Regions:
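N-terminal periplasmic "start-of-domain" segments of outer-membrane beta-barrel proteins
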Residues: 42-78, 131
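Short loop/turn motifs that connect adjacent beta-strands in outer-membrane beta-barrel proteins
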Residues: 176-182, 213-219, 285, 371-373, ...
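Gram-negative outer-membrane beta-barrel transporters
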Residues: 765-769, 773, 778-780, 784-915, ...
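Transmembrane beta-barrel wall of Gram-negative outer-membrane proteins
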Residues: 197-330, 352-363, 368, 672
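Extracytoplasmic beta-strand/coil segments of soluble accessory domains associated
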Residues: 81-127
Length: 1008
């Protein structure tokens, strides 16, 4: 660390000295510099941006697709994530996070390229990331108003930084010398959400840039600021997983969910960005720029949700229920055969998060002579985030639920009496609280030095080589307990430590609730009953509000103790907090050292000219992690004097200690890019390379819990004990010894450019992945009392599978200039991507019958999925990968008018296997050989899929004069429904339906 700082200071001092040396020559150099053209000419307008992006693709040394801002601060969508989905081969998720599919994201979230989520993110060709336990940027955190464009590299060269098997996304900002002189850009927008009526969200940006000739050369300065708010609402229906039931319809098995539920969520976010750049050019040979980039993201959502909480095997059906051909319930009236009603929880949940990323970078480029040039680049980036997730729930026993699951969306029917019952606060009781806190910080420092030697040769063009050094420290911390679920009053506690529930009808427990009427639910397409929810203040008031609620439980507990004369049997509530458990802390330190060499060449005198580059990148990665391993010996009872037989049982002392882990590996990454020019407008590319993606930091946590499980039988009369079995197992939250996933990738393209904004391109690709990270077992050893090493089989992330992604990308764009009159402004953009994938574990974990609980150690469940009838699935594709996706955009640019209507669609994709809402531990054991056959004790986890989804967006702008334009934008014009499917033996069953409604934006722009 100290050496890195000293080197950085020395480098900076050397660069300042270099600038000072050239100051004396600046006056004579100014006359030469005055005639220099700016590095980049900013294009304006939709057509101009398409032309510029096509030119980047056509001239690039690598396979790349680009999007260029139409004007200052004007990318074609409201978020970087939504912009990326327009690129061929790129898809985005529609949930807030990949671990929580129950909450919809209006602006999109995780990005995949060619079906792979291992995507590297960069800002101006440098590392960029968020403090989220991963390695990439949360693109939704970045203000699109600060971007000049973005590039998506599909098969990067040796010169580019390693780390993205799926691809590389480089976000580009402007520099002062990109403009000929002074430049000002101002924009203002306001967005209206149709579903969240009455909510207007302002946005705006301002950019100032200028350049001056001085005594030490030309100097430029640029300042850019963006502010954006978004307020949206999402409504959702959900159906619980289906359970096999042989006790409802005589003589046959039918599949019945335990309920249908609904929710509504209001989401608010603020996004700010600040960017500044200083640029200096002493003469034609020496230039430097210093940039500062800061993005801040704040979000808060509050949700009112109903969820089924009954025992699924207590659910009964009134006569007249109907079923699908596979036996799944279609229509019927449900009731609870044991309790007074179907148990539901209805919660008020809030989540808030603040995140920021700060990047400071300094670049110096020096051309020593006609042959040699050198570049030095220094960067420091810091990312932080912290959040609170807080839930307070009441409970209600719904008398009945009449459902119709035969249509596109679940339909619910309630009588007036049932609606009145659900709207009455006296029907509810206080149920539970749950909170989670997290905070993370990551700091990275990087320096790279590159050199280029330009040949005077008919074939060899230049040789590029360089080195790069980085150091990144990361700390991710979760509260202890992680998600602290704490009961206030539950039906299963009755007769145990309480005699009554904490009913709101009891004056001691009343108040601070409200009636949610679900106005305009599903944009008026569904009529659900009003429900009583806790006030939001209970959730936002953590921890004091929680303490007050858990006093209700203490009152009930003391009441039972007084009535029975027994001692109180109630646990004291404690809030989740940081510290106290090393399982919540993940500290990582990583250093990388890389070098590369790349030769560019061109056979221009061939009949069909060929050019390209060949190179190799070598990188060494050194990782250190702070960890913790815990082992508590089991307690076994063997009567004194018994003879013990069976397998030997080692005596292992209690073990609980901090662990220091170190891991290092190196990768050699060759690459080849070739381009054949059949004509000036027709070219073909071939690219082949080896790529790598390092494990996410969250997967590298060095925490493990070890368990010694001894099963024995005591034979009392015979005075003997038989050890039936002894196993040494464990669970790891991560694995600090993970290696990167690697891939060999091949691309072949054909590109026809038949106009300035007109082209047809086709790309074939094949990626072969090795060491894909999956949940499997690895060995861990600790000594017993005799010093003999004992081997524990620990379940955690390992490099345990190989994979494949093969497909094709097709893109077409054209303006129809030859059409008559106003029609000559019409244009079209179309692209389509097909991806086929597969994974194969090194060691198969599939079992036709599931067993065990819903834990990390259940490999069959976590990798293959298990149904509620205890049967495994297997044969699942790579997650987040859609086999088909496409974009269609109708464009218009004529005179002052510019318009676009864009449709984006992707086919269904696997979101997860063991995720919230579609997992449990009460599946049926259907294995005939199992001693618990027929019991409800098997862990289950359903593969959850996002169904096909398409969305229509549109924009219209009018250029009032050279400086001013006005416009309208619309997102999700067709009010699309996002649907989720849960895979079960009876088919792909509807799990959830989400709507967020259209959004409309009015905007004005001014620039000169």
């Amino acid at each position: 660390m100290k050496q890195f700082k000293l080197n950085a200071i020395a480098l900076a001092a050397a660069q300042i000295a270099l600038m000072s040396t050239h100051a004396a020559h600046a006056q004579s150099a100014q006359s030469n510099a005055a005639g220099d053209a700016p590095v980049t000419v900013v294009v304006t307008g939709q057509r101009g941006s398409i032309e510029s992006a096509q030119k980047i693709k056509q001239d690039s040394d690598e396979i790349v697709d680009s999007i260029v801002a139409e004007d200052i601060g004007k990318l074609p969508d409201r978020s970087v994530t939504e912009v990326l989905q327009r690129v061929v081969g790129v898809t985005i998720d529609r949930t807030m996070s990949r671990g929580d599919p129950e909450h919809y994201s209006v602006e999109g979230s995780g990005v995949s390229i060619r079906g792979l989520s291992m995507v590297r993110s960069e800002l101006n060709g440098r590392d960029s990331f968020s403090a989220n336990g991963g390695r990439s940027l949360n693109f939704e955190d970045v203000p699109p108003e600060l971007m000049a464009g973005l590039d998506v590299y599909k098969n990067p060269s040796a010169e580019q930084i390693e780390g993205g098997i799926g691809g590389l996304v480089n976000l580009r900002t402007a520099l002062p010398f990109d403009f000929k002189g002074a430049k000002v850009g101002i924009s203002a927008q306001s967005t209206y959400s149709e579903l969240r009526k009455g909510k207007w969200s302002p946005s705006g940006s301002v950019m100032l840039s200028n350049r001056w000739k001085t005594g030490i050369g030309e100097i430029g300065a640029l300042f850019d600021y963006a502010y954006s708010e978004s307020g949206t609402r999402t409504d959702g229906f959900q159906v619980e997983p289906y359970y096999p039931r042989d006790d409802i319809e005589p003589g046959k098995t039918v599949w019945v969910p335990k309920g249908t539920q609904w929710r509504t969520l209001n989401f608010d976010r603020k996004r700010q960005g600040m960017y500044g750049a200083l640029q200096w050019k002493a003469n034609a040979d020496l230039r430097s720029h210093l940039t500062y980039f800061k993005s801040k993201y704040e979000m808060q959502w509050d949700e009112q949700a109903l969820f089924a909480a009954s025992n699924p095997y207590n659910i009964g059906l009134r006569p007249g229920a109907t079923y699908s051909p596979t036996g799944a319930l279609l229509t019927g009236t449900m009731f609870d055969r044991v309790d007074a009603g179907i148990n539901f929880g209805d919660d008020t949940r809030i989540a808030n998060r603040k995140s920021d990323t700060t990047d400071i970078s300094w670049n110096v480029t020096w051309r020593a002579n006609d042959r040699w040039s050198f570049t030095s680049d220094l960067q420091r980036i810091k990312a932080r985030t912290h959040g609170l997730d807080s839930t307070v729930a009441t409970g209600v026993q719904m008398p009945e639920q009449q459902i119709d699951l035969s249509g596109n969306v679940p339909s619910l029917m309630f009588t007036d009496a049932q609606r009145a019952y659900l709207a009455n606060p006296n029907s509810y009781y206080w149920a539970f609280t749950q909170e989670h806190l997290d905070r993370s910080e990551a700091v990275s420092k990087a320096w790279k030095g590159d050199a280029k030697y330009t040949f005077d040769h008919p074939v060899l063009r230049d040789l590029r080589f360089g080195v790069r050094f980085t150091k990144r420290d990361s700390v991710n911390e979760n509260s202890n307990p992680d998600f602290n679920w704490s009961p206030i009053s539950q039906t299963w506690q009755l007769g145990n430590n309480i005699n009554n529930l904490a009913w709101l009808a009891d004056p001691r427990f009343s108040g601070a609730t409200h009636l949610t009427t679900f106005n305009n639910f599903f944009n008026g397409k569904a009529n659900v009953p009003s429900l009583v929810f806790p006030d939001t203040s209970w959730a936002t008031g953590f921890p004091n509000s929680y303490a007050a609620l858990h006093e209700f439980h203490n009152i009930l507990c003391a009441e039972r103790a007084a009535a029975t004369g027994q001692a109180q049997n109630c646990a004291t509530w404690s809030p989740a907090k940081f510290g106290g458990n090393p399982a919540g802390i993940n500290e990582q330190s990583e250093k990388t050292k890389a070098m590369f060499g790349q030769l560019r060449f061109g056979f221009d005198d061939w009949k069909y000219p060929v050019d390209g580059n060949v190179g190799v990148r070598y990188v060494k990665t050194e990782m250190e992690a702070r960890g913790f391993t815990n082992f508590t010996p089991p307690t076994v009872t063997i009567p004194p004097g018994n003879t013990v037989t069976g397998p030997a049982v080692p005596t292992i002392p209690a073990f609980s200690a901090d662990q220091a882990y170190a891991n290092s590996y190196h990768n050699v990454l060759p690459s080849l890019n070739l381009r054949l020019k059949a004509r000036d407008d027709l070219q073909f590319r071939f690219a082949m390379s080896k790529a790598m993606s390092r494990p996410d930091f969250k997967d590298l946590q060095g925490y493990a819990t070890l368990t010694q499980d001894i099963k024995l039988t005591n034979f009392i009369p015979e005075r003997r004990t038989v050890i039936d079995s002894m196993t040494l197992t464990g669970e790891g939250k991560g694995n600090p010894l993970l290696r990167p996933t690697t891939a060999t990738q091949v691309d072949l393209t054909a590109e026809w450019y038949f106009g300035r904004a007109s082209s047809v391109t086709v790309a074939l690709f094949n990626k072969r992945l090795k060491d894909v990270i999956v949940q499997q077992s690895y060995d861990y050893q600790i000594p017993d009392v005799n010093g003999t090493m004992q081997n524990f089989t620990v379940t955690g992330p390992v490099n345990g599978a190989r994979g494949r992604a093969t497909g094709v990308e097709i893109a077409y764009q054209q303006y129809f200039d030859k059409l008559p009159g106003a029609l000559s402004g019409l244009g079209v953009q179309v692209n389509y991507t097909f991806v086929d994938s597969s994974t194969k574990p090194y060691n198969s974990t599939f079992s036709a019958y599931c067993s065990g609980g819903n834990t990390a150690s259940n490999l069959n469940l976590n990798q293959n999925g298990c149904d509620t009838n205890g049967r495994g699935f297997g044969d699942l594709p790579l997650q987040y990968l859609s086999r088909n996706s496409y974009n269609v955009a109708i464009l218009y640019d004529k005179g002052p008018w510019s318009a676009r209507a864009a449709w984006s669609w992707r086919s269904k994709n696997l979101q997860g296997i063991n995720v919230n809402g579609t997992k449990g531990g009460d599946g049926v054991d259907t294995n005939p050989a199992s001693p618990t056959f027929g019991q409800h004790n098997v862990g289950w986890a359903l593969p959850l899929w996002a169904d096909d989804y398409g969305q229509l967006d549109a924009s219209l702008s009018y250029q009032i004069n050279e400086r001013t334009s006005i416009g309208l934008e619309a997102q999700n014009l067709t009010d699309a429904k996002a649907k989720q499917l849960m895979q079960q033996g009876i088919g792909q069953m509807g799990r959830a339906w989400f709507v967020s409604g259209p959004r409309y934006t009015a905007q004005m722009r001014y620039s000169f």
